[in-house]
Structure formats: C-alpha cells, structure tokens
C-alpha cells in the first residue's frame, strides 16, 4: 500500500513536469517577469523591520501575479517555501516567518519558474547566489524613528545670522594661522581664501531669532557645525569640549583692553580673548543660552544634533595650550605643550621627550600643527573624558538629539581600537539618551561600523551626493574634476547607487544625511556650470558664472 502511494506521487510529479514542458513547447506560459520581483528591508517586507534577538519576523516577497511556480526564503540555517499571503494590483505577495537568534541573520530568495531558477538579494535579481549580497538583519540594531526621512537643515553658525553683536570676535582679538582675527563689517562680503579667522558674527541668538523661519520651511532637524570654544569660524579645532564658545553664546565679563597691536602675535598677550573664553561666567552663560535654544527647538517639535570632533582637537585646546592662553589662568592646569608634568601629557603623542617646556613635537592630524591628534591609546583618562562629553550634551539640560562625528574612522591609531572606541561611545550615548542618533562622516564603505553596535548611519556621500553629482552635473563634489562620460550616464548612476546603498543596510539608509552639498564641498549650484576650480585660483566669480538653476531644481526634487 505504501509503495502504491509512493508510485502514485511519483507519477503525479512526472505529469506536472510534462505539463510544464508542454506549456513551454506550446508557448502557453506567461513570460517570466523578473522586473516584478522585489523585497527590501522596509517594514512592508520585513516585520518588525528592526527585530531583537528572539523575535519572530515575517518576511515578504513580491512577484507578478501567477508568474512563478515557487519562492523560497533561504538563510544560513534553512530553506523555507514561502506561501502566498495576498494578491494586489497585479502582484502576488509571498511570506514566511523566521525566528531571529543572537547572530546576524542573512537571507536571500530563490525563485523557480519552470526550468528557470533565479535568486533575489540586496542587489536585485541574479542567476547565481553570491553570499556577500544577502539581506542582513543585525538583531537589536534600531535607529531613531524621528530620524527616518527627516528634513535636516545644516547651520554653519558664524554665517547664519548675527543675533547679538556684543559677542562678536573683534579685529586683532588674537592671532591664528599667520594673522590676526578679523571682524567682517559687511555681511555680504565674499569670504577670503584663507577665511578661517574671518568672523561674520553669526551666533546662537541668531538661530533663536530664525526658528519661525526654519519651522515654516519644514525643517525637522537642525544640524549645527561645531559650537564649542575654538579660535576658528569652522570650530573643527576645539579648545574646550565642555563649553559653547562665548562668541556664539553670551559674553557677560569682558576686557576693554588686550587687543594685539602691530606685529604682536603672542596670544599670551591677547587679554580680551583670554577673558572671553576662560571666564567661567561667560562659559556658563553660553551653555545656558544653548540649553534655552534646545528647549525651544524641542518645544516646536524639532530636533537638534551637534558636530563632535573627537579625532583631534585644536592647538588652542586647554589640554595642549600651545598659545599659552590658560598657562596663568586660575583653575586651569598646565597644558601638555607647556609642561612635561601636565596632567594632559598623555592625551597627545610627543616625538621629542627632551623638548619641554613648550614642546612642539606633538603629532598633528595630517601633520597640521593646529590640529593635535588625540592619543586615546595613551590615556584612559582621555578616553573616558570624551565618553562623558558624548553623554553630557545629549543629557539634561541640553538634551541634544545626537552627534555628527567628524572624520570618525580616523580616531585612534588602529582599526581595532577605532571600533572599540565607537562601541563604547554608542553604549555611553544611548545609555544617556536612547533616541539619540550617532551619524558619522565617512568616505568609502561604512559596513564595518554599521552592525548595530557602533554608528547608526553616515553622511551619505557614496550613495547620494557623489553619484547624483556626477549624473546631473558631470562634476566631482569639490569641483575638482569634470567628466562628460558620467554626465547623464544612467547606467553608471544606477550602478553606483545600488552598490553603495547595499553597504548601508535599511536602518542606516533611512536615517542617512542626504545632502547635495555642505561645508566640505562646492555648492551644488556651482557644479552645474561644469567649471573645474576653487576660489584660491579660479576666483569667486567663477563659482556663480553660467550656473543652471533648472538642474539644481532637479536635484532638489530627487
């Protein structure tokens, strides 16, 4: 009886196979529509989209209606035949359920159509399975819901709005990179080529004054370039991580003297600057103003993220004190440049142990002596200090909603150390504010940092700014190169987008910072003129000559 049943089953399979063959011979089968095949990591096709270990996940796959014979969900552990769970608008939807363990869950789809077997992975349809292209689930990796698809507005504070002229940097207040600070009197003046010491007066009060405007624009997240104490207008050379620069905040205690005159370039004589940036009343008043700003931003239902520059600091930094600003100030220990006995000596790497006092032999990031590289491997105290900084600003009373991390992959002196630091940084920040985002500046493949225990996402250069710029303008994002072969090249554009989007994973992709341009690159509108060059040798006029606003509108629409 059992043998008869087995023989009958085998006969039925043979009949079905013959039927399929006849359908091909008679051209009765519908054409296989591989373009209809689809799945991704969004909540519609994966529920929950960001599962934790132990969760049961429903995974779905789409085909054209009545167009395939079977669909299988294939993982490293099992091959499960999926069942049709619905039909809508000419599509069949297949589903299967899996339980997620502690480890990364990788999967792909196997589609059978008559004699044809193909596969679907993170890159789309393929005829051969490639494991590196599988969909991936990192258990417990979730990104803040508020950041998914949010409209972000970047503010380079000094160039936004001068809301409080009493805190403006004045001409000759101090000396920096070869010359004295300059107070720009005319807001519309074109910035100098070496404009890091030119100040237009933008500040936090200016942002406060324009919140109605920003809200009316539909801004949901404000991203501020660095705001901590610093001698430059870009402030990627931090002087004190614990305080907002009083030139952006409040100056309640000032010095009427102490401007550098004539050839004097000794910042230990810059009494006005020293008073402004070391007096605790100014520093605390500036932090209080920032707390008021963040509270008002949150009251309006908006978010705010800060720029964290933790790979390096500035030569003015109180830990280094190359300018001897803190050397004789009460309450400040000697900087590592000043004394071999400084408590901060191990915060930096010095190449000449016999060069004190005033040791200039420290390592600078990319050899810039104004940007001392922080030596985390040499100081657990520094390591813990920066973790506390990460926590401080996302906690009360500031309650910032996250960090943009400058040159994040450069931190430390090895890849292993870099990854360990960002794992600890994530734990510290998320413990203080679970809904804070950790968004890194990164060029190249970020996969190694996007596994759920380091960064949430990145500034999306590779999967947005770069390919879109080449496609619409033929220009490199700094305006350093023009390639006519990439202008309007849809094949190159789609290929680049698919390749680089795969590296981000869906949670990171949904929260990535998609910009057309920013402070590190030429303006997108400038790129539409197809002119290679920079202000330093092409002149400022070249940036606006022959631009094409229509292309800019296309980019904004995308």
Language model: regions and residue ranges:
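Conserved alpha/beta catalytic core and glycan-binding cleft of carbohydrate-active enzymes
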Residues: 316, 391, 422, 426-427, ...
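Glycan-association/targeting regions that enable binding to alpha-glucans and other polysaccharides
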Residues: 1-154
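Short amphipathic alpha-helices and their capping/turn segments at secondary-structure boundaries
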Residues: 12, 140-145, 208-220, 294-298, ...
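Hydrophobic faces of well-ordered beta-strands that scaffold small-molecule active sites
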Residues: 151-153, 222-224, 304-306, 403, ...
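Short, well-ordered coil/turn segments that N-cap beta-strands
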Residues: 218-220, 298-302, 398-403, 433-437, ...
């Amino acid at each position: 009886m059992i043998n008869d049943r087995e023989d009958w089953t085998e006969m039925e399979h043979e009949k079905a196979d013959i039927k399929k063959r006849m359908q091909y011979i008679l051209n009765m089968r519908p054409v296989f529509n591989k373009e209809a095949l689809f799945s991704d990591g969004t909540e519609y096709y994966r529920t929950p989209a960001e599962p934790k270990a132990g969760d049961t996940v429903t995974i779905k796959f789409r085909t054209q209606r009545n167009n395939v014979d079977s669909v299988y969900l294939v993982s490293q552990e099992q091959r499960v035949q999926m069942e049709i769970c619905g039909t809508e608008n000419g599509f069949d939807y297949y589903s299967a359920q899996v339980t997620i363990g502690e480890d990364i869950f990788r999967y792909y789809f196997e589609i059978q159509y008559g004699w044809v077997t193909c596969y679907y992975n993170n890159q789309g349809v393929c005829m051969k399975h490639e494991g590196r292209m599988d969909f991936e689930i990192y258990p417990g990796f979730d990104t803040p819901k508020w950041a998914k698809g949010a409209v972000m507005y970047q503010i380079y504070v000094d160039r936004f709005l001068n809301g409080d002229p009493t805190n403006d940097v004045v001409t000759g207040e101090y000396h920096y990179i070869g010359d004295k600070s300059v107070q720009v009197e005319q807001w519309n003046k074109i910035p100098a080529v070496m404009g890091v010491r030119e100040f237009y007066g933008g500040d936090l009060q200016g942002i406060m004054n324009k919140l109605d405007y920003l809200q009316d624009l539909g801004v949901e997240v404000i991203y501020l370039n660095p705001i901590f104490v610093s001698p430059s207008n870009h402030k990627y050379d931090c002087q004190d991580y614990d305080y907002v620069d009083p030139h952006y905040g409040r100056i309640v205690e000032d010095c009427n003297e102490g401007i550098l005159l004539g050839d004097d370039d000794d910042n230990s004589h810059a009494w006005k600057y020293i008073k402004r940036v070391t007096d605790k009343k100014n520093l605390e008043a500036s932090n209080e103003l920032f707390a008021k700003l963040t509270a008002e931003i949150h009251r309006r239902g908006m978010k705010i993220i800060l720029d964290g520059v933790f790979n390096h600091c500035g030569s003015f930094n109180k830990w280094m004190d190359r300018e001897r600003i803190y050397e004789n100030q009460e309450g400040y220990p000697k900087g590592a440049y000043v004394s071999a006995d400084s408590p901060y000596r191990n915060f930096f790497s010095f190449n000449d142990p016999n060069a004190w006092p005033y040791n200039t032999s420290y390592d600078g990031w990319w050899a810039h002596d104004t940007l001392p590289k922080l030596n985390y491997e040499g100081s657990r105290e520094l390591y813990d200090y920066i973790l506390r900084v990460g926590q401080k600003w996302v906690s009360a009373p500031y309650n910032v909603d996250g960090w943009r991390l400058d040159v994040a992959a450069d931190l430390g002196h090895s890849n292993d150390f870099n990854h360990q630091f960002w794992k600890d940084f994530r734990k510290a920040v998320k413990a203080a504010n679970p809904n804070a985002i950790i968004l890194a500046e990164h060029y190249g493949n970020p996969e190694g940092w996007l596994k759920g225990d380091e960064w949430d996402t990145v500034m999306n250069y590779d999967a947005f700014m770069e390919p879109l710029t080449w496609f619409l303008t033929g220009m490199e994002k700094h305006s350093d190169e023009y390639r006519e072969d990439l202008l309007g090249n849809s094949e190159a554009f789609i290929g680049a987008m698919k390749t680089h989007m795969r590296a981000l994973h869906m949670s990171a992709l949904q929260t990535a910072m998609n910009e057309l341009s920013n402070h590190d690159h030429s303006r997108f509108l400038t790129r539409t003129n197809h002119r290679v060059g920079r202000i330093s040798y092409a002149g400022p006029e070249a940036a606006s000559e022959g631009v094409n606003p229509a292309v800019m509108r296309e980019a904004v629409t995308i």
